[in-house]
Amino acid sequence: MKEMINVVAVGTGGFVGAASRYFISTLVNKLNTSGFPIATLIINILGSFLIGLLTQLLMSLCPDNKKLNLFLTTGILGGFTTFSTFSLETVNLFQGGKAVFGVVNIVLSIAFCLTGVVLGKMLAKTIASM
């Protein structure tokens, strides 16, 4: 029964995260005419920041709440961020003759997503120490 509750927590969070990703992607893609996959980049940077922030806060404030951790990180942020879409869009850029965009997407994604995690963890440590 305990595992089923964990599965429900992850599944519910996954729904929230995936629906949020869809909403943001749709909104950003209506505004983006460049051909660069900015929506996925924004989502992955935001998700990276939030996973750094939330994991650090959860570790500091409620380390024993596994269900909340599963719901927020594995569920919501797992459903929100998307490495597979990043990969597909990058391959499509290369195959579509936009190699420069492909390289830029790789560099920006890695640099900003890692930076997002670090900044999120730093902010969480500051919040937790207040």
UniProtKB/Swiss-Prot annotation:
Predominant cellular place of this UniProt entry's protein: membrane
Residues binding Na(+): G78, T81
Location in the cell: Cell membrane
GO terms, molecular function: fluoride channel activity; metal ion binding
TM helices/strands, residue ranges: 4-24, 35-55, 68-88, 99-119
Disulfide bond positions: none
Alphabetized UniProt keyword annotations: Cell membrane, Ion channel, Ion transport, Membrane, Metal-binding, Sodium, Transmembrane, Transmembrane helix, Transport
GO CC terms of this entry: plasma membrane
Keyword Cell division on entry: no
Regulation of protein activity: Na(+) is not transported, but it plays an essential structural role and its presence is essential for fluoride channel function.
Catalysed reactions, as listed in the record: fluoride(in) = fluoride(out)
Keyword Ion transport: yes
NCBIfam families: crcB
Sequence similarity: Belongs to the fluoride channel Fluc/FEX (TC 1.A.43) family.
Protein name (Swiss-Prot/TrEMBL): Fluoride-specific ion channel FluC
Organism (species): Ruminiclostridium cellulolyticum (strain ATCC 35319 / DSM 5812 / JCM 6584 / H10) (Clostridium cellulolyticum)
Gene that encodes the chain: fluC
